[in-house]
């Protein structure tokens, strides 16, 4: 994680929650290959929507489509060797072992993009400021476009592309452990030609382009240490032909440098660190609304390709973001960032919403659906606390982000006079209690292929049950303290922290809800009432 923001402490050692040893549990059975997104929505999500209408909408129809690989078993990556002399590609993430790189901690990215809409080509420069966590004779970064040139601390460096996005760097001089250094990467390419698997985070059409996705998207447009365990500051400049808008994260510093007749440069700055996938870039013809909502500057953007009545509806939804944030603040504490926003492109996205930091990306079909728009916005805005301010240490920690964002839909409804969150838990349990396939997907190890499946229901059910066991005072204090302590932390830390807020032994509860591949018994000890 970055140390540039004074709120970000040094990485904490993971706390082992010894009361819940995985070895004592039956092995998780592998599930079948995850079906295609559309088929999955029709076969699984639509029945759940009926439940959501009766209970409290979960917004499952708008979950993110991910890479579909066989499930994997959680493994602990080997500790980094402080005496090592070469950074390695991949951080040993159990689901995405090649994601990220070892040997350094990024402090800040300064990204400069030149976009040519005629050739649909990016020409870019990423300046990476980092601190070496070990002595480095060489290291890697992630970029799927063509690397044109690299310098390290001002001196030319050798580079070799390896695999899909690993770029090997050999600096002219070794980098000493604990020293700061700067890497400047020049690159170019057509993002539309970069593909991994059957989907890609790049969307183009109708004179607009957007790059946004989870768990991977940065490699399509900037050089990065592409893993959520290494958040960093973002400074993004995008040069486009005059008449186009270019949208990204953080605060809009300027939209035209004024020194070019035919081009505008849009400059965005994020003042709090973020994971690489939480950054995005959108280019096209957008209508913008700017202002201040209770002290928070906002920029909302909606594609001008959408009909006027749809733009009006989309803006009306986006303008509720401030009030939704204030509701979430009553549960999770102060909003963790200095800007708010949202963007609605014309493209048919493969997700309904994505928690890009300070400015979520919303699919037009999703935000124009009046039944789902409220829970969609609440879910993505809740991610500003859970998923953005506090990121996963590894991707198998996804419960700590998607679970809370989904529970926030229940909690916000309760806070604003809607159905009680406990009623939502009981109704969901009644519908799902006999669905063995659903319960086989555990929260401790959902498997890569099912990373974003059961968590949208089992996650909020677990949290509401935990609330019932801990009591409101302890549950909300614990959740606020967790959300207000920025950093990258594992699920094991979350369980250990929860235990520290109550005298109730949570070991049996976590065995039932986090570890077990079977339905939790309907008991008071498991949080039912």
Model features per residue range: what roles?
Residues 359-424:
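Zinc-dependent metallopeptidase catalytic helix centered on the HExxH motif
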Residues 3-13, 17-123, 203-208, 529:
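N-terminal, polar/Ser/Thr-rich
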Residues 308-310, 420-421, 452-526:
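Amphipathic alpha-helical substructures
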Residues 125-146, 222-226, 233-241, 492, ...:
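Surface-exposed beta-strand/loop patches in extracellular or lumenal glycoproteins
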